[in-house]
Amino acid sequence: MRRFALILVALALAACHTKSSAPPCEAVAGQFFLLASAELDTATVDPATRRAVTDQLPAMRDALKDACKDGAWSPDVRSCMVLARDHAAMQACEQKLTDDQRAALNKSAAHL
């Protein structure tokens, strides 16, 4: 009977433990990609610049994803970025990063 009670307690504890509902870093990077692509679509730039930026967007997306994962960005930051609807909102979310996380993000962007 005692063993049965222990099993019930273990099951109850497991049921109470839920996985974080915060979006993963891939979703953060995907939102950045969507916003950057949309902004580029409306930008007044010459075709060569548009092509060059378009070609860089996947690398920028991947660098953001890696910085997010490697820096263990908080659920609050990830949620903020996924909900961002424009570049200014995304930048506001970046202000929630720690100094070290922001430095790592800037460093990864500088290598592109």
Language-model segments: residues:
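Positively charged n-region of N-terminal signal peptides that target proteins for export
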Residues: 1-4
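Repetitive helical segments and hydrophobic/amphipathic motifs
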Residues: 11-12
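N-terminal Sec signal peptide cleavage junction
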Residues: 15-16
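Post-signal peptide N-terminal segment of mature Sec-exported envelope proteins
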Residues: 23-45
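Compact alpha-helical subdomains of small soluble proteins
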Residues: 50-112
